[in-house]
């Protein structure tokens, strides 16, 4: 059975994080948690953190000095003329007093956070870049100290810093969502770490979707390809052009009810193995089990029944969906999450 993943206890210097997690941004409407799969208004469907350290891996964990590419998946089915996306968080408060990001009165209208004292605006845009400042280092140092002193902390050498994403339409519509930025002293952790207490935290990488398929059976996502990922035009059949977001031209989407799936590479990066700890330290390891949440601007959806009721949900129930397209053009979204703050997606328009 897949275990629940919990963040470590946070420290006084990270007062921004604990209150924000405690409130859960209850007054905000998270685009990730809404269960209506038909997108008919401005929505934030996902948000991801991407760190490129030059090794070819799309990392999700960051440490001081890393430049993070923050990306939001914003759906705008009604073609609002202008949508402004703002990313904010709150500065750490060493006195453990209430920050604007944890003030329920402020969060009733999250737009008020923009420009407030104590609120750090990371940038404006669906995709922005942000470099982790040196002020975060004391938090990471305390994570190391905590792992050295507590056996049960050796598998969770990270903190989650919630980022607030605010999308404002020129028509007056506003939606918000929360993305956890995972911060870890990753250069000190892993199997090769010199400190034994840090050898059992595995830096998290983002999962990926490499194709949208109509599978030939429910045991694997293989069959007729509707759209495939690409890095260049050479990856696309028939001389197609690789899009700026890395997808080849799509095939026609057939009418009628179709079983479709998102293909997730079965590699150590896309589906990682990580350790879990108990009171006496490391208890074992297990694999991630990525799940895809599906959205569309039209049509109808139906879930796939899990056949593995005794343990982790099977592949089909996690990454497949029954879908009937509308007669008009539509966009299909698939957001994959690994349960460890890693995230990616496909957003494909079909005629």
Regions found by a protein language model. Give the residues of each.
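Sec-dependent bacterial lipoprotein signal peptides
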Residues: 1-26
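Bacterial Sec-dependent N-terminal signal peptides
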Residues: 20-54, 246-248, 343-345
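Short, solvent-exposed loop/linker segments at the N-terminal edge
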Residues: 53-67, 249-260
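Short beta-strand elements
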Residues: 159-165, 170-225, 342-351
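Disulfide-braced loops of extracellular cysteine-rich modules
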Residues: 228-241
């Amino acid at each position: 059975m897949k275990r629940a993943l919990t963040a470590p206890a946070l420290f006084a210097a990270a007062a921004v994080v604990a209150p924000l997690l405690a409130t859960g941004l209850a007054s905000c409407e998270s685009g990730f948690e809404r269960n209506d799969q038909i997108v008919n208004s401005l929505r934030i469907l996902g948000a991801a953190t991407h760190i490129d350290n030059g090794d070819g891996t799309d990392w999700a964990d960051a440490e001081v000095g890393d430049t993070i590419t923050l990306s939001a998946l914003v759906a705008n089915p009604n073609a609002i003329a202008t949508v402004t996306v703002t990313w904010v968080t709150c500065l750490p408060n060493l006195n453990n007093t209430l920050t604007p990001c944890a003030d329920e009165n402020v969060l009733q209208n999250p737009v008020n956070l923009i420009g407030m004292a104590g609120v750090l605006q990371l940038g404006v845009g669906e995709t922005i870049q942000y470099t982790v400042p040196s002020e975060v280092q004391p938090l990471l140092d305390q994570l190391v100290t905590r792992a050295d002193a507590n056996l049960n902390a050796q598998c969770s050498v990270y903190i989650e810093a919630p980022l607030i994403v605010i999308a404002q339409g020129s028509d007056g519509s506003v939606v918000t969502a929360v993305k956890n930025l995972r911060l870890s002293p990753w250069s000190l952790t892993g199997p090769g770490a010199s400190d034994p207490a840090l050898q059992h935290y595995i830096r998290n990488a983002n999962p990926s979707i490499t194709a949208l398929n109509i599978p030939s059976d429910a045991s694997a996502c293989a069959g007729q390809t509707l759209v495939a990922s690409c890095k260049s035009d050479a990856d696309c059949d028939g001389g197609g052009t690789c899009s700026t977001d890395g997808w080849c031209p799509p095939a026609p989407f057939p009418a009628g009810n179709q079983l479709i799936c998102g293909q997730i590479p079965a590699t150590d990066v896309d589906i990682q193995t990580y350790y879990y700890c108990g009171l006496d330290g490391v208890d074992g390891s297990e694999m991630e089990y990525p799940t895809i949440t599906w959205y569309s601007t039209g049509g109808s959806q139906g879930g796939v029944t899990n056949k593995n009721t005794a343990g982790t949900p099977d592949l089909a129930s996690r990454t497949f969906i029954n879908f009937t397209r509308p007669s008009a053009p539509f966009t299909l979204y698939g957001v994959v999450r690994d349960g460890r703050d890693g995230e990616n997606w496909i957003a494909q328009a079909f005629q």
